[in-house]
Structures are given as structure tokens and as C-alpha cells.
Amino acid sequence: MAKFNKKKLPSRHTSLGADRAPHRSFYYAMGETEKDVAKPFVGVVSTWNEAAPCNIALMRQAQSVKKGVRASGGTPREFCTITVTDGIAMGHEGMKSSLISREVIADSTELTVRGHCYDALVGIAGCDKSLPALMMAMVRLNVPSVFIYGGSILPGQYKGKDVTVVDVFEAVGKHSAGKMSAKELRKLELVACPSAGACGGQFTANTMACVSEAIGLALPYSAGTPAPYEERDKYALLSGKTVMNLLQKNIRPRDIVTKKSLENAATIVAATGGSTNAALHLPAIANEIGIKFDLMDVAKIFKKTPYLADLKPGGKYVAKDMWLAGGVPMLLKTLFDGGFIHGDCMTVTGKTMKQNLKNIKFNPKQKVLRAYDNPLSPDGGVVGLKGNLAPDGGIVKIAGLKKLQFTGKARCFDNEEAAMACVQKKKYKAGDVIIIRYEGPVGGPGMREMLSTTGAIYGQGMGEKVALITDGRFSGATRGFCVGHVGPEAALGGPLALLRNGDVIDIDAKKGTINVRLTKSQLATRHKKWKAKKSSFGSGTIWKYAQTVGPAYLGAPTHPGKRKEVKVYADI
């Protein structure tokens, strides 16, 4: 077992010397021995709660992490932080809390580690914003760290087919259109979510789980095993052991997360037809380490990456199927073979990506993952857009779309509720471009996801017949011609705020353009008449967020990151 010089670790501030006798008394009160207190302290943070199935299995896995830490010479210190689960927050004001929770999770993890002087960190997360949040905290603190996903939910079974919660969201649209009875809707909702774990398709949680392996912060294969399976405890135990190895070798998150590894992460998102939210989270992670990696940098990777994974919502299969087919490492291997992955990036194994992938072979007998030279489509499932309607950019998920160009007339709504009411009453028509504005990071505040609205549109059979544009976000589960992250946002006087009903909009996902048929002078004239809307929040966390949040194309950061860092926590 390795020996550690505690005099060189942050925890010396809470455990060494006569003046720290009161601190040590607290540890003895919790059952730790003098030997335990003399060892490195490892924070074990999870986002466990009972809000939804996504995080319900995390406390169990945390116990296995702690066993791994102790077995390798460390003293684990478990703590929980919050999470807001999008599936519950969706479709009402609660969704304003979702993206904000990313910052609170990262900040609270930072404060806990700083306040108690932990030497290393293992983070376990199971829902959309908690995954990037813990990765952000890791690179911000820069103590040796390992991320581990809590695992995906098992698919439900309805009429002999695999289903996920997204089928229920879309069934709401079918029900409102008279295409599904209340009895059938109830049958579906009762079977769609049969276990613990995050939503089962290639939605945001599973997208960011793939990112955790591709970026190098998680152990190979750890993203794939479903939450209910005992194999998750094996990876949790190994993660606890791994973080101690990283501490011994002084391999830190900023040695792992680099421009190249961020490009690897964007590549896995594109290859899996993953969530557009990754284009928000990767720039936010980059901000923590002072790297410029914005929405359009992500989009460049998306444009040149083949789409290889036939996963829901654009494809046929769920996360469990990808795991059985060969998991993230097999997909990374074929991408590496095709020259799409940087092999020289360090990972938490203490080896490079190339070394990790050395003995992995592609299995051609499965149907979920394609080889790099036999893609579902030659470019990624997500495309960046720019034009006079989105000078800072926007993003659209094209995985599963049959048509990549759309021209139509604007139907403008100043919040999601107004748009949803229109959709529920079916007061829109084929060819409309539904605009949902004032839902950006500042305007929302909180940049809500629009799954309830897009799910209802798709359920009504209109998913390919209309387009939707917003300065808000979309769930990773969204289907249809939906453009999000449009900036500058309406609340800041961006072009979305200047649109009127009937304005003609052209979207071309092949060329990567999004424009309204208005001249510069017409837009300028409208801008002179525009007046900012008063926020519906004058105090509290949501108000505070709106005062500090940056633009979506930079990841909606709430602090300057490493650019203005004076000293990093790990070196205190």
C-alpha cells in the first residue's frame, strides 16, 4: 500500500499539529482512528436524492467507492449535494432551476472540499446537470479526481417494444390530438420507467456519461452498466482505488482535461447523436481551465464526425443496448482507428487514451454501433448554426431528421407556457416556425428545456412539419427540427426579440445557417423600438443567477474561470 506525505496535502490544515486537536476530536467522534486521520482525506460526493429514479442508486455506489478508498490507504469523507431532475422539473417554472443547479452543484462541491481541505475527490452523478457540474468542480479544484456515472434506467416494455419516459412525453401529444386514449396513456406511464437510473436513451445524462469516459475523467466501461446492476459497485470500488493511485502519482484533472480531450468529448457526442446540451456543458468545463472552447468550436467537431450510434431519440436503441454491444470504449476505438480521436490524452487510468484502447476490437455482429467507415451518416448528429438570427450561434440536433432545410413563417411566443397552450389547442399549422423567446440564461432566467412542447408537437404528428427556435434549451430527448441556444438571447436585445409573426425564416442544417429575411437596416430600426422586459424574479437564487450568468455560446458560465484565477485550491 502506498504511503503519502500528509505534510504536502491540503488536509494537513485540518489534521496535523497540536493546534488541530479540536479538529481531530471531531473525526474521532465519527469513528475514525488516529491512523485514519493520518491518511489522505478523499471527498466522496454524490447527488443522491429521492426526487427521481436518476439518483436513487447513488448512495449504494458511494459505499463501494469508500471501500475502494480505504483499501488503498485513504480515509473517505462522504457528502451529498443537490440535484434538480429535469424529468420532474419539465414543463413548468421548476425548469428554471435546472441549469442553475449545475452551478450550485459545482459551487457546493467546491465549498465542501475547500472548507474541509480534502485531498482528492470521487464524484457520482446520475442526472443531466449533475454530471457536468461535478466535472466542472473537479477541474476547478484540480485535486486528483475520478468521476463515475450512476447508470441508466432499464427500458420499459409496452406492446412488445422498449420504451422510455420520452415515449410518455410524446404520448401526451398523441392524447391531446385524440390519437391515444387516457386508458392507454395510463398503461404506458405505469411501465415506462421500471428501475433506478437516468433516462435510457442518448439524452443528456447518457451523453455526458459518454463524455466522462471520452474526456478521460471516468474509468473505461464505467458509463455503460445500468443502475440496477451490481456491476456498478465493481466500478465504484475501482474508482475509489483509482483516485488513490492518481493522488500517489499526482495526476490531476487539468493534466487530463485539455483542448484535445475536450475535442474527444465533442466527438463522442456527435458520434452518438447526443444531446445538444453538451454544447453548453463542454464550454463550461473549458471555462474552468481557461481554454477557449465555445459553441462553434464544438460545432466544428460535430461537422466532421461520423454519426455511428443508432440510439434513441433519433435511432432504435437505448443505453443498455450500447453497453451490451461494446460500450463507450468500442465506439472510441473505431473513432480512433478513423483518426477522429486524439490518442495522446492522459486519463484517470494513468494511461493515455491510445493505451486504454490498445486491446479493444470492434464487434461487427452487433447492430447498435457502426464502424467509422460505415456510418449512419457522414457527419455528426448535431449541427451548429449561424446567421443574422443567431450571430453568436445556435444548435440543432439532426439525428433522425429526414429534412435538413426548413423555411417558414414565425409564430412568436414570449415564454414556453404560451407556446405550449397554442400547441395543446393545435392552433398552429404545418410550415410554422415556432419562436419561444425570453427563455435564455438571463431572460428565463435559467434557460429552460422545451421537452414538454416539442414532445407534444411530435406526438401530434407535426414533428417534421414545423420548426422551433428558442434562446432556451432542448432536452436530449427532443426530436424534430428544433434550434436552441440562439444568441444573443432575446432578453439582451438579440435578433429573436425583434421577430414578428409572419417574418420568413430560413434554416439550413447542411450549410449551418439560420437567417430571417430582414435587412440590417430593418433589424436596426426594430431594435431602436425594442424595450427590455422586466424580470419576474427580483430576489433569490434565480435572480442572483441572472446577475452573473454569461452567454450560452460560452457555456453560460457564472464566473471567469482560470483566466482570473489567483491560485488553485489543490496547491493551498
Curated annotation (Swiss-Prot):
It catalyses: (2R)-2,3-dihydroxy-3-methylbutanoate = 3-methyl-2-oxobutanoate + H2O; (2R,3R)-2,3-dihydroxy-3-methylpentanoate = (S)-3-methyl-2-oxopentanoate + H2O. The modification N6-carboxylysine is found at K129. [2Fe-2S] cluster binds at C54, C127, C199. InterPro entries: DHAD_IlvD/Edd, Dihydro-acid_dehy_C, DihydroxyA_deHydtase, DiOHA_6PGluconate_deHydtase_CS, ILV_EDD_C, ILV_EDD_N, IlvD/EDD_N. The active site is at S475. Coiled coil: none annotated. Keywords: 2Fe-2S, Amino-acid biosynthesis, Branched-chain amino acid biosynthesis, Iron, Iron-sulfur, Lyase, Magnesium, Metal-binding. One of its GO terms (biological process) is L-valine biosynthetic process. Mg(2+) binds at D86, D128, K129, E449. Binds 1 [2Fe-2S] cluster per subunit. This cluster acts as a Lewis acid cofactor. Homodimer. This is Dihydroxy-acid dehydratase.
